[in-house]
């Protein structure tokens, strides 16, 4: 019968040096199956579920206002993740132009690897084009998302100017 537990080779000088420095484990050979998967994981999962249910029972907060089926809201807004798209379609004078702007976004994203192909670095500080495109996109998307929640006359300037 083969050994299930892996025993360390304590005659190995590299292992001895690591253990002297505090690297490595003080114990060896405890398998993940069945100890972790059958005993620890269910306890963590049940603890997480009971914590979420307990917090939901102790503080039953409402998710927004109750809806009134007989009253139409003044302005119908999409879900939060569609605010930037809604803002572009709302502020562009031609709807065809708004749709064309929406199609240029994925096309521009597909061009980034080809533009940045000359730079082989993975560090974002050494990839100025990709970093600047990413930062501009994040700021512009947040600007559009915040502007979508404001009235249309303040939406482009966010009421700041």
From Swiss-Prot:
A GO cellular-component term linked to this record: plasma membrane-derived thylakoid membrane
SUPFAM superfamilies, sorted: a domain/subunit of cytochrome bc1 complex (Ubiquinol-cytochrome c reductase)
Record family assignment: Belongs to the cytochrome b family. PetD subfamily.
Cellular compartment(s): Cellular thylakoid membrane
One example of a Gene Ontology biological process annotation: photosynthetic electron transport chain
Its membrane topology: Multi-pass membrane protein
GO molecular function, one term: electron transporter, transferring electrons within the cyclic electron transport pathway of photosynthesis activity
PROSITE patterns, sorted: CYTB_CTER (PS51003)
Name of this protein: Cytochrome b6-f complex subunit 4
Transmembrane regions listed in the UniProt entry: 37-57, 96-116, 132-152
Annotated keywords: Electron transport, Membrane, Photosynthesis, Thylakoid, Transmembrane, Transmembrane helix, Transport
Record bears the keyword Electron transport: yes
Organism annotation: Acaryochloris marina (strain MBIC 11017)
Role summary: Component of the cytochrome b6-f complex, which mediates electron transfer between photosystem II (PSII) and photosystem I (PSI), cyclic electron flow around PSI, and state transitions.
Record text on subunit structure and interactions: The 4 large subunits of the cytochrome b6-f complex are cytochrome b6, subunit IV (17 kDa polypeptide, PetD), cytochrome f and the Rieske protein, while the 4 small subunits are PetG, PetL, PetM and PetN. The complex functions as a dimer.
């Amino acid at each position: 019968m083969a050994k299930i537990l892996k025993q360390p080779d304590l005659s190995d000088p590299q292992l001895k040096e690591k253990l002297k420095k505090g690297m490595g484990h003080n114990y060896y050979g405890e398998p993940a199956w069945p100890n972790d998967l059958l005993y620890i994981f269910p306890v963590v999962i049940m603890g997480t579920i009971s914590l979420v249910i307990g917090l939901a029972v102790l503080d039953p907060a409402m998710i927004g206002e109750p809806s009134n089926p007989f009253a139409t809201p003044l302005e119908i807004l999409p879900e939060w993740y569609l605010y930037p798209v809604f803002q572009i379609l709302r502020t562009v004078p031609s709807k065809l132009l708004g749709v064309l702007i929406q199609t240029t976004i994925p096309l521009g994203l597909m061009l980034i690897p080809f533009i940045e192909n000359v730079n082989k670095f993975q560090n974002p500080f050494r990839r100025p084009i990709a970093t600047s495109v990413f930062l501009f996109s994040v700021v512009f998307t947040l600007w559009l998302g915040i502007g979508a929640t404001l009235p249309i006359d303040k939406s482009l300037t966010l009421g700041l100017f």
